[in-house]
Amino acid sequence: MFSFRTTSLLEQPDLVLKNGRLGLLCNHTAWHPEYGEYLFETLAKRGNLKRVFLPEHGLFGELQDQIKLDKLNVYDSLGLNGVEFVSLYGTDENSLTAQKELITDLDALIVELQDVGARYYTYNSTLYNLFRLLKKEDINISVYIVDHLNPAGRQVEGTMLEGEYTSFIGIEGLPHRHGLTIGEMSSLFYSEANAKFPLHIISANASLITKDLLPWSIPPSPNIPGLFTCFFYCGQCLWEGTNVSEGRGTTRPFEQFGAPYMESLINYNKRNGLMSWNDPENPLYDQGVYIRWQRFIPTFHKYKDQSCFGFQLLLNPGMQYHSLSHALRTMRFLKDNCPEFEFRPGKYEVGNDKKAIELLVGDSVLLMYLNGECDWDVTKEYIKIEEQKWIRKAKKYLLYDEQLCRVK
């Protein structure tokens, strides 16, 4: 059973929400200023909240990327007597999926998380694992998804993940930038699993808060500090698979990138008769952004306390920008022009032993391009075809009027 609700969660008349034993998968983005409190506080006051499941980054988005949440006693000071906290991002790989017995004693499960529109973002993976558990174990529990708008909008970028690159940072079949809300993604997971449990999506338009405030104002994780970050993240996240800093440890992660060895590029334009990095003849040129060369010093993560030569990307108002394509071209440029450039070695993420760049790119054709085995025109056309395939597939799961689109 599936339903799409147009009134807010707390206005729902369902008796299971008022009297049933509730579980809640959430973090700090489930905060509602009309009540001045988090959803877990509101439900705890009702007396029927039994369990809170936590995704990567913790209850308040306080943990950096890939930091395991094992010490749950840090939440004891909240004073939520009788409410159990469960980590879905612990050291044990099995923690990524909730244990069956932690679900079967509940009557309903509520989910409220703010996604950012990219397949690497693990909140969707946590939700996907939950749906797979419900389907596999035939658990007939009511699930309520409090939807939020996608801050990255309806633009689609990239190719659908190939099965061999599946991991916790990539669900097979999802493109790099999917254009869906978390409610619409839930509908897709539900349909593809042929699930039967009752699924109810609470419209993002049911509350002015979920529609207008939350997607833009509360950072969903430590390195997505603002709205603009979401427009860059789809492409700039690929730097995680290299020895280039993606800007973690600065106030502008994913909006800037660099490395100490990139200092060798400082005279590139002069040597090649180019006016600047924004010269249309420059290999890094993209009409969607202005490129500002700079230096920055990360306070943690890659190149901690070291001066990095690099670039800040500034959106060009009114122009379309394909972050993934720009990142791929930039990465190929660095590979060809900086001998020190390397892909990050070793295992990167649970569920797959492949290197980080393979899991993040997730496509054999795009990896061939990065390795110099095919040219950009072929790659660009391939990306276009893949984006068109995804739009045709995903449009039946749309819950709102605005349609999916791609950069022409």
Predicted regions mapped to residue ranges:
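Conserved functional hotspot residues or short segments at active or partner-binding sites
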Residues: 259-380
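C-terminal regions of mature proteins
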Residues: 367-408
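Glycine-rich phosphate/diphosphate-binding loops that line cofactor/substrate pockets in enzymes
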Residues: 9-22, 100-108
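Short hydrophobic segments within beta-strands
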Residues: 25-27, 53
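C-terminal and late-domain segments of enzyme folds
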Residues: 5-9, 16, 26, 35-37, ...
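Histidine-anchored nucleotide/phosphate-binding helix
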Residues: 34-46
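Chitinase-like catalytic core of GlcNAc-active glycosidases
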Residues: 51-200
